[in-house]
């Protein structure tokens, strides 16, 4: 980013070889973790996670995805970018050059069969 004093740069390092954290290892209080697990077992709904950069949003979301992942489910994500790949989950990178936006990806997902 250009500033009056010169360029400002931030570098984000992702360690692709690291294992995705288990929900138990994220430091939630036991009761909070149990509530999260209960919500994740529901057949539908929305869980919204927000926070500043570096607060653990992606780590929490990837842990949740791993928790619900099984062969009976068709889990699809739309990400910008896909930070970590999870076997068994269909992860889609947003690609504006190919006109693959979040909106178009979501519309395509909604047209798919369940499995």
Segment roles from a protein language model:
Residues 1-55, 60:
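N-terminal "pre-motor" subdomain/linker immediately upstream of P-loop NTPase catalytic cores
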Residues 35-47, 53, 58-115:
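Switch/coupling sub-region of P-loop NTPases
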């Amino acid at each position: 980013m250009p500033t009056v004093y010169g360029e400002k740069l931030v570098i984000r390092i992702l360690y692709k070889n690291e294992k995705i954290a288990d929900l138990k290892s994220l430091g939630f209080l036991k009761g909070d973790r149990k509530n999260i697990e209960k919500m994740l077992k529901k057949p539908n709904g929305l869980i919204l996670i927000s926070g500043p950069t570096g607060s653990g949003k992606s780590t929490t979301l990837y842990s949740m995805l791993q928790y619900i992942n099984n062969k009976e489910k068709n889990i699809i994500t739309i990400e910008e970018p896909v930070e970590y790949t999870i076997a068994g989950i269909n992860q889609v990178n947003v690609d504006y050059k190919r006109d693959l936006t979040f909106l178009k990806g979501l519309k395509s997902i909604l047209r798919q069969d369940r499995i």
